[in-house]
Amino acid sequence: MAEDKTYPMTEEGKVKLEKELEDLRINQRPEIINRIKIARSYGDLSENSEYESAKNEQSLLENRIKTVEHMLQYAEIIDSDKIDETEVSVGKIVTFKELPDEEPESYTIVGAAEADPMVGKISNDSPIAKGLIGHHVDEEVAINIPAGTMTVKILKVENA
């Protein structure tokens, strides 16, 4: 992981990551350690699928812990209240419509750590967010997406 990369996120996103880290350390880690102990008690580890499974889960868990710790260490909290209220940025809800005549869509732009497209939270690293960030209400913006280029008009920007 690059040491100089920051992870833009809202305060809410940071709190969510802190809670996840606490759960990983306090609940999940001891549970997996206990499963490893139980699997060891079965004897021969060379053919012990429970042991192998628990060790694999432990490896995934420890990697997730390291990732979350790194993201929190290099978190850049975005205070959307300090950004022009008409400018699209992390922590803002943006409503736009694809031109010429599509229905309006609204998304909250968040850091990658808190993105959840199923609930309308898109990562600042996504093509749509990258194309919108820095633009203002009433602007028409050409956005490069994997399927080509889409032109949108920004209708509204508000704090999340």
Swiss-Prot record:
Coiled coil: 9-73
SUPFAM superfamilies per record: FKBP-like, GreA transcript cleavage protein, N-terminal domain
Family matches, as Pfam families: GreA_GreB (PF01272), GreA_GreB_N (PF03449)
Superkingdom of origin organism: Bacteria
GO molecular function, one term: RNA polymerase binding
BP GO terms, sorted: DNA-templated transcription elongation; regulation of DNA-templated transcription elongation
Signal sequence, start to end: none
Keywords of this entry: Coiled coil, DNA-binding, Transcription, Transcription regulation
Role noted for this protein: Necessary for efficient RNA polymerase transcription elongation past template-encoded arresting sites. The arresting sites in DNA have the property of trapping a certain fraction of elongating RNA polymerases that pass through, resulting in locked ternary complexes. Cleavage of the nascent transcript by cleavage factors such as GreA or GreB allows the resumption of elongation from the new 3'terminus. GreA releases sequences of 2 to 3 nucleotides.
Record family assignment: Belongs to the GreA/GreB family.
The protein's name in its UniProt record: Transcription elongation factor GreA 2
Originating organism: Lactiplantibacillus plantarum (strain ATCC BAA-793 / NCIMB 8826 / WCFS1)
The encoding gene: greA2
